[in-house]
Amino acid sequence: GGGGAAGGGGTGGTGSRAAGPALAAAGAVALAAAVTAGGLAVPVRTAAADTVRIAVVQGNVQQPGMDFLGRPMLILNNHVEATLELAEDVEAGREERPDLVIWPENASDLDPHRYPQAYDAIDRAAKAVGVPVLVGALVDHPEREGYVENQGIVWDPEAGPGASYTKQHPVPFGEYVPYRDQLSKVITRLQRVPRDFWPGQSTGVMDVGPARLGDVICFEVAYDEIVRATVNDGARALVIQTNNATYGNTGQPEQQLVMSRLRAVEHGRAVVTAATSGISAVVAPDGTIGQRTEEFTQDVVTADLPLRDETTLSDRIGPAPEWVLAMVGLLSCAAAFATGRRGRAHGVNRTDEKRRQQ
């Protein structure tokens, strides 16, 4: 009888211990659901304070892959050609004159500050269309020999190059090679990245004609802190200058466009994706795609871009919910681990007790 009572008490203790991890997990799930539901319940205002007319030029490339640039000036000439055609359409009344034009990342593979032919080509396009052009260009670092900067440059039709943004987060093994001296000796393929990109130190908030835009280059759209800082520094709309030619005919361009849609909703801002070979698109503040291009085509997208000044809840609280959920997850795992250890120790003690009783 006494043994039965002891056994019954042991079963009850095991049940309460087993419930520990389950309760911790349930609490974590409940908190995650509450945070998610709270986010969905917060309205995102998408009304525009005002709008600007934009044109996004997708000049296209000759071939996908690592050798997309081809010979010097090839990609630049494609974008100049498409912009000159836009200017002709404007002069003929077939297209409304935009307030500004956006070119993609790497639209000029030559530094326009060092190569007169690149400077003249860009200047000719800007003068023809008669409005500022945001030009994506590779620019030699002014002080560090051998380094290059990935920039977005505001090119005025009268004053020429002005404000610029330098990509803050170059891609390892794509735009720079970590431990180049050591790795290049054993991985010869790394020589296809001949120069390292130098990172910028500030956000890309610039006045492009009448619009105060936030420039974000390529995969920087994936980094919460870069996009959030750009909006908080005063960007009224976001521009993602990108070159997806090396990822042609893969899911990457669609993936990046989905990221642009996420950022639009997150920050309540219109997002313009300008790509050398596609996908270029205009995303409304609610995440809907207004216009988009096909890949590996030369195209020009025109649209009225809404500009906003209000900030969203996400802008104001930043990464706090992510940290809270991460801590809840870690604490839940720690609680489950500790409970499991106590359970195993109790099981060993009960086994020893039974052996002594026998």
Regions found by a protein language model. Give the residues of each.
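Enzyme catalytic cores with a strong preference for nitrogen-chemistry domains
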Residues: 1-358
